Amino acid sequence: MSIEERVKKIIVEQLGVKEEEVKSESSFIEDLGADSLDTVELVMALEEEFDIEIPDEEAEKITTVQSAIDYVQNNQ
């Protein structure tokens, strides 16, 4: 499974959205209905899945599906 597929799978599980709703340009809050707690839990799930640490200042920049994919790809 690619990084993109793994990230999207985590988003589907964490936010309870349908897979087809999760597009690269989707914003977690505006498009996928996440709140601030959801985004924190999403970052924690990404850290666990990919065995990385995401500092708070970086986590705040992860607001879309693509930004999550890019962050993981650049920090693995």
From Swiss-Prot:
One GO BP annotation of this record: lipid A biosynthetic process
Main location as per UniProt: cytoplasm
Keywords: Cytoplasm, Fatty acid biosynthesis, Fatty acid metabolism, Lipid biosynthesis, Lipid metabolism, Phosphopantetheine, Phosphoprotein
Pathway: Lipid metabolism; fatty acid biosynthesis
SUPFAM superfamilies (UniProt xref): ACP-like (SSF47336)
Stored InterPro entries: ACP, ACP-like_sf, PP-bd_ACP, Ppantetheine_attach_site
Keyword Coiled coil: no
PROSITE patterns: CARRIER (PS50075), PHOSPHOPANTETHEINE (PS00012)
Molecular function GO labels: acyl binding; acyl carrier activity
Residue ranges of domain Carrier in the record: 1-76
Post-translational modification: 4'-phosphopantetheine is transferred from CoA to a specific serine of apo-ACP by AcpS. This modification is essential for activity because fatty acids are bound in thioester linkage to the sulfhydryl of the prosthetic group.
Subcellular location: Cytoplasm
Chain positions with O-(pantetheine 4'-phosphoryl)serine modification: 36
Cellular component aspect of the GO annotation: cytosol; membrane
Similarity comment text for this entry: Belongs to the acyl carrier protein (ACP) family.
Record function comment: Carrier of the growing fatty acid chain in fatty acid biosynthesis.
Database matches in HAMAP family: Acyl_carrier
This protein's name: Acyl carrier protein
